[in-house]
Amino acid sequence: MAFTTRRRVEFRDTDAAGIAHFSAFFFWMESVEHELLRAAGIAVVDRDGDGQEVSWPRVSASCDYTSAVRFGDEMEIVAGIASIGRTSLTYGFRFTHEGRPVAEGLIVAVRCLMHPGRKPQPVAIPTELLDRLAPYRLPDAPAGPA
């Protein structure tokens, strides 16, 4: 089962031609990612069992565009877990407007211990979190973790 939500193209999301600016899709993907995590009962920033801060920095993001949307258009966004690695999640996103494909994107996020002033340290995704994410696996997603 994928996660489905909606977003309306706001004036701030458009370019001089009144079309949704490419960068807005990255904001929408991150926003929907956070919404999916909340639906799964997972905090974006949390503490592990030892009280250390844990979060999900993005290490890759991409988006391919197939048609334009404009100010006021409402899109349906379908998101889900495309693949799971030992420390990473790959989210897939599909944007449509009135049934017409608009864009598809991917975000790769890595579960990390966050140490102020130091590089984030990747850590394994706990089984409990994998279980919470299971309902959001995309139908054609590999079984993982890799």
Language-model region placement:
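Terminal targeting signals and extreme-terminal segments of soluble enzymes
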Residues: 1-76, 82-146
